Amino acid sequence: MDNTVTNDSDESKLSKEEKLKKRREQLALWRQKKEQDSKNGEKEMNSNATTSSDDKQKLRQQRMEEWKKKRAQETKIDSKESVKESPKQENSILKRLASSIKKQELPFTKKRILFDEEEEDESKRKPKFKKPTLDGHTEDLQHREDDPNGKIDELDDFIASLSKQESSSNDIPSQIIEDEQLEVENEGDSEDEEIDQDKKQQELLSSKFQKLQNEKQLETIDHSTMNYSDFRKNFYQEPSEIQNWTAEQVESIRLELDGIKVAGSNVPRPVLKWSHLGLPASYMNIIEDKLEYKAPTSIQSQALPAIMSGRDIIGVAKTGSGKTLSFVLPMLRHIQDQPDLKDGEGPIGLILSPTRELAVQIHKEITNFTKRLGMTACCCYGGSPIESQIAELKKGAQILVGTPGRIIELLAANSGRITNLRRVTYVVLDEADRMFDLGFEPQVTKISSQIRPESQTVLFSATFPRKIELLAKRLLYNPLEIIVGGISVVASEITQKVELFEKGESSQLEDEKFDRLLNILNVFSIESKHSKVLIFVEKQSAADDLLVKLLGSNHPCLTIHGGKDQIDRKYAIKEFSSKDSGVDILIATSIAARGLDVKGLDLVINYDPPNHMEDYVHRVGRTGRAGMKGTAITFVSSDQERSVTDLVRAMTMSKIPEDEIPSRLIEIRNQFLEKVKAGKFKYSFGFGGKGLEKLQQIRDSTRSLQKKEYGPNDDDDVNFVADKTNGTAKKDGATSLPASEVAVDLPDFQVIEGRAPETSGPDKSKFHSRITINDLPQRARWFVVNRDSLSKIIESTSTSITNKGQYYAPNVKVPQTVTVNGKESPAPPRLYLLVEGLTEQSVREANSLIRDKMIEGLEVASKESNMAPTGKYKV
């Protein structure tokens, strides 16, 4: 009996050991299987990672479509069930589920079924939490039935739980996978949408920029293919009285007429009477009766016969000498000889002016004749509504007076349907030196390319430096040069005075100047009532400051400068010109030194001295016009040696005796010239440095390019050869740079990973972008780089935005190297914005905001260029 008990116990021990061994083997197999599955999963992930981006995108799209279809089907089923379901149907479902479980466990399983049914959606939404299932419960019941003792082995229970975890991990709800796929798809779609949005914004920016560029682009005209009609240039028949003059008589007459100097071949002899010109009676009535001009002035005596003979001329004469009438009379005779304008044809006479005020002055002079002669003239300039100008041109204007910028806008508007220059045969450039000095050379060249080559071109100015003379000869064919009274000479009718202030503190010097100005104004107002005073200053801010001071001293006055709107400038000139306005003082920058002709202007005060002598001549030339007397007073300090030298030179050239010039001025002049000889200073005069070539680096690069192309010849030995095919003059052997070399850089918004090399220090960011803004219009650039715009973008995107590079004019090629302090270094690139950020997303957001600002700025620039026309015609 005892042996049987021991045998049974040994067998039970053996069976337990076998069971344990068997379970351990099962556990090892399970672990091996799990490791193998994990390796297979890693391989699948690696294979998926190596797939191309295109395959991923296609797979995403397919999955997205499948998910959408399945989602749509589920929503339909859910909607149907929500409508049709009832408590009876719910009970029948529960009964069917309950029937699959044994009867003794029905009460328990019903509860579990109900619990599982209620939490089904939650299990889908929260897959991390393990939920009990009916399958696991039935397995537990089977284990209990297999065990005869009804006991549950701990190891069996552990292995069963592991198998359940494995099965649950393999059986992840499909809804969770689909949700993950949907998230990936949504991320991909959002990236695609962002790329599409950036692409659309870039296309919009490009189109607006191109549209703004095209507004000022003129079509290239091949004049050799155009069928131009012939026209007459020569309207002058020399009277027999003049034909009988000998050469000595002609020279003496020219000497009497303020020393006229002429250069060129076959120069006509000067005239002394209006009748010598052979003008029609209608012209003579206006000249002698209405305008009361008794005889031609010096410039008119020589220029009128030369222009009426059909010659191109360069006329240089002092201010107020009647240059305007010298080109107006031949132009009217020229137009009257040609057929009337037809619909769609442009003007016959074209007059270009560097400033708006001068254009208005010329137009006013022309209207004295056009009203009686049945002609029409149109004045076009920027800063005023364009619709009225378009309306006048549409009606047909035989004479067009304007500034180069606005004329180009009108020519380019509506693809050239507003007006054209095919009928133009007479061209005038008034104040031509200032035209080139202000950087209008590209615009003038553009306009001249639209005009037939054999047209007659006339240039007039009060000064004509050698540099500008060479540029002007490109536009003329075999021109005559007529110089009256010398170049850059103040008229003898003007009394020149200088107020010298010794060097001191700036505030003290300013107080002394203002006190002296008040004394002069008080004395002048007593001696010359209702006379006008024009005060010149150097800067716009100085004009506004002086206005406040004079108003505080009970001196009514107005200001005019480039920073004011056109309507304000026009109002200021109108009030100043009126006798009864009560405003007898006008403060201005050098913008009023050209074309301002006000009757009763007896005093000009240079509160700040001009920076060169030519500007001085034009400033003081606003008084003493048409033979009247005038006074010019210039304020200068002893440390302004260059200005003092110019003043002494101007007075000397005006034939003022040296003993009448203050000795202190001559002393300062001599000291300065000694410094120039010693090489301490460089003394130059004339216009220059305010136009397109104002940057030293650009001047150096231009000079080096010219040396390579033209050779090291001196400017004085340059020979000009007329090119009859295009009406321009070229240097021997000159070759022009192709236009393609000067390209317009559109802004690029590419984000680059890594630190920008142009920044330094520990704060370098991980992503950066360079946005070129050099070639944007000035208004658009200001819109982007102004402090408010950049600060908002920096705050909202947490990026760093810095201005880099240097501004280059659109037609200027960036040099490779520049000379700084005698050393050559790489030239700075075109102006751009450097955007830096810690993340790629922040840089992209900043780029997007900058792009929006650019688009907004281009829209504003386009509106301002057209002045928002509201009339019948629009650009």
From Swiss-Prot:
Biased composition (Polar residues): 162-173
Domain of life: Eukaryota
Region of interest (Disordered), ranges: 1-92, 108-177
Domain Helicase C-terminal: 519-669
Record carries keyword Nucleotide-binding: yes
Record has Nucleus as a keyword: yes
Subcellular compartments: Nucleus
Motif stretch (DEAD box): 430-433
Protein name: Pre-mRNA-processing ATP-dependent RNA helicase PRP5
Organism: Scheffersomyces stipitis (strain ATCC 58785 / CBS 6054 / NBRC 10063 / NRRL Y-11545)
Lineage: Eukaryota, Fungi, Dikarya, Ascomycota, Saccharomycotina
